[in-house]
């Protein structure tokens, strides 16, 4: 499973 970077994760969170 490929998870997005912290930056993207916070944006989609």
From Swiss-Prot:
Tissues and organs where the protein is expressed, per its UniProt entry: Expressed by the venom gland.
Residues bearing the modification Pyrrolidone carboxylic acid (Glu): 1
Compartments, record wording: Secreted
Main location class: secreted
Record carries keyword Secreted: yes
Keywords: Disulfide bond, Growth factor, Pyrrolidone carboxylic acid, Secreted, Toxin
One function term, GO molecular function aspect: toxin activity
GO cellular component: extracellular space
Keyword Glycoprotein: no
Function: Snake venom VEGFs may contribute to venom dispersion and prey subjugation by inducing vascular permeability and hypotension. This protein induces vascular permeability through VEGF receptor (KDR/VEGFR-2) signaling. May also induce angiogenesis through VEGF receptor (KDR/VEGFR-2) signaling.
Family that this chain belongs to: Belongs to the PDGF/VEGF growth factor family. Snake venom VEGF subfamily.
Subunit and partners: Homodimer; disulfide-linked. Interacts with high affinity with KDR/VEGFR-2, and with a lower affinity with neuropilin-1 (NRP1) and neuropilin-2 (NRP2).
Name used for this protein in its record: Snake venom vascular endothelial growth factor toxin IC1
Native organism: Macrovipera lebetinus
Taxonomic lineage: Eukaryota, Metazoa, Chordata, Craniata, Vertebrata
């Amino acid at each position: 499973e490929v998870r997005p970077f912290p930056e993207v994760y916070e944006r989609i969170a």
